[in-house]
């Protein structure tokens, strides 16, 4: 019986293996590896995947694969390597940083191109993801289409398959070779994500009459794309009524939008003479700018502190120390952002009195965009209060101010 079961499983796996091999053999000439090279030495600094997507020879990949060409054009160059070993320098034609896509071109003769699938496949449809994982050569991974992610700010396809570093920018195709999405990220354990093909079609349509971007034009385009994107989602947040939840003696902002997730915890050390309840919320749709810089972050944290063991002066000392504590930062280097500049004030919103500090730092390469940190402490009680911290990355100063006000106006004191 055991032998029969093993034999049946082997027979079942043969058609799957044959299908995978068939897909790769039919479409491998349309694939490329993209190598990012240090300009002065030619040493490899990064690797990704791509594929021919037009009769003109346009190649699609991820924005994050080629971002060094935009942010550090004097330090990096790039080349493509085809499956038959041909190499050629590439030129950046266009990109969509919000959806992590880019179009490049080489001087190689145009090859057969992949076609884009025009509808969403049924849930459970088999997909074949192709790329160059860990610089180990071209590899095909079979997986399953599981539809679009729910509660996500940006459309992504949930792909059940194992994507690895180096596969970014490669296609995920149906058995007929039509592209359903572009490999973009993984959460491990066969949970991976694809950029839907409709965004590829839109970018290719825009790129078909373009002939390349200078570094200056590319950087300006990056700034414009991120600025337009933050205006759109910040307006959406400001226009959405804030839901609230109880924390201590207050009503505090809870889930600001479907794409924001929240969780809570309580902390009470045996030697600690005050109680602490923490609620944290964040989006999971951060945007990649460069290997040192992340933007699009939306995070906030509430802490309810209360005590029966401390007098008002002792509690205020603890409260002030917590208010001054640093909140985990937004990933960025000193080359990416300036130092924070802060303004502190006392304000009242409805029946809540606050001490408020609003800090901004400028994005050096993306003028007009800032990272903002709002810290506020309620001042209505002598032995309890809420400390709240709001973090926004890559927003305009005006949107930081508008949303900070919108956020604070949602607090209520319920003594």
Question: Which residue ranges define each predicted feature?
Answer:
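Non-catalytic interaction/regulatory modules that flank or connect domains
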Residues: 229-340
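Signature of long, low-cysteine stretches enriched in small and polar/charged residues
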Residues: 317-378
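A conserved glycine-rich beta-strand in the N-terminal activation segment of trypsin-fold
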Residues: 19-20, 37-56, 88
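Catalytic-histidine neighborhood of serine endopeptidases
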Residues: 47, 54-97, 302-308
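Surface-exposed amphipathic alpha-helical segments
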Residues: 211, 259-260, 382-415
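Active-site region of chymotrypsin-like
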Residues: 27-43, 107-113, 136-212
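C-terminal cap/linker of serine protease catalytic domains
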Residues: 20-24, 90, 179-251, 413
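Active-site substrate-binding loop(s) of clan PA
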Residues: 23, 69-70, 91-93, 106-136
